[in-house]
Amino acid sequence: MEYNYPKFTPEMKKTHTILIPNMAITQFRLLEYALRYDGYKCEILGNCGSAVAQLGLKYVHNDTCYPALLVIDQFLDALNSGKYDLDHTALLITQTGGGCRASNYIHLLRKALVKAGYPQIPVASLNFSGLEKDSGFQMTIPLARRALACIFYGDMLCALRNQVAPYENEKGAADKMVEIGRAHV
């Protein structure tokens, strides 16, 4: 049976809040700025913990790779929270296009959304290989440049943090430095 999933349309850029899983907190928080600059209303999810990690097992096969399970768990927990208008919420997930199962996360997520009672939630794909041709999420050259700059800057902040953290005199000073650096983007 084929499921006709809801599409993320260009018009939804103005009306929908896009939820993004927290895969690399420093880089993704910076990426959030790039997406907002381009007109997208988005939010990086901060929900985590063992309760969140167990949620996806209700809707995803337990043989699914653990990172996929965690990402789907984050989305379902956020949708269950009551914090979002479910008729004006969309999800954004990356697709690698490689041999890893990560290219299938989007299909696992859509299936889990239907099972969890959220068939109306569109899922947009962030990929550079044309895997989802009907997505209204547009990766323009200016957005791609900003996104790459955010990822590189986030990588540098993380590398700097990892180098100075063992030598900090005040516990948490390295993390504060990352927050200050992130705030200056």
Which stretches of residues belong to each language-model region?
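An N-terminal assembly and electron-transfer interface module characteristic of large anaerobic redox
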Residues: 1-184
